[in-house]
Amino acid sequence: MTGGDSGLGRAAAVAYAKEGANLVIPYYNEHEDAKETKRIVEKYGAKCVILSGDLSQKEFCKAVVSKTLETFGKIDVLVNNAGVQYQQDKIEDISDEQFDWTMRVNIYGMFYLTRECVPYLKSGSSIINLTSVTTFKGDPQLIDYVTTKGAIVGFTRALARNLALKNIRVNAIAPGFFWTPLQPNCWVAKKVPTLGADAAFGRGAMPYELAPTYVFLASDDSSYMTGAVVHVNGGEVMA
């Protein structure tokens, strides 16, 4: 499960641990966050391996899969949760470096890790990709981020058809606004108090409100779902 060191990923990791799942969590460089997630997960009796590295690099993705197989002997579920976003008011302000990094983390990393995992997935396995409500409504200040999240929807649907006859499910989650460490660090301070106000509920959500969706899509309860995008956005977009 990528990006399980904090935010939505940590909430999902804890939910999986409560269901008895062991986890491998690749993360970038938030070492203390990753250690805290590991501590919480292991409190529930699950095993947790944390691996620091850059998912946009193929060799690290290969190492993640190798370590998972070495430790647990199999892969049942892949959760592509990691991502980055940066606010820019104008497309002219998006540097080549920002655009490239956003693409590499959000798309290339997902592709590389999925490609490495698929040969080891058995019938009944599940792949869960994180897209975003912004794919379905647009966001004028997150142009490169929204581009990647739209690509993830296409990737999910195409891969779902590709793997269906192997009985490997591929679905996506499209969250609305959730209060995670990513959000205040991304937006200008004056906008932070209004975040989440576009939802029908008039508020942002907490990560624990999304965690059960990750568990559902990993479980046999979703055995007839593939290629789906599950919207958990408080009514911000109704599809």
Model-derived regions, located:
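Alpha-helical segment proximal to the catalytic Tyr-Lys
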Residues: P119, R161-L165, S223
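A glycine/serine/threonine-rich, flexible loop-to-helix segment
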Residues: Q141-L142, L165, G176-A200, E209
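Substrate-binding pocket helix/loop in short-chain dehydrogenase/reductase
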Residues: D89-I91, S95-D100, L195
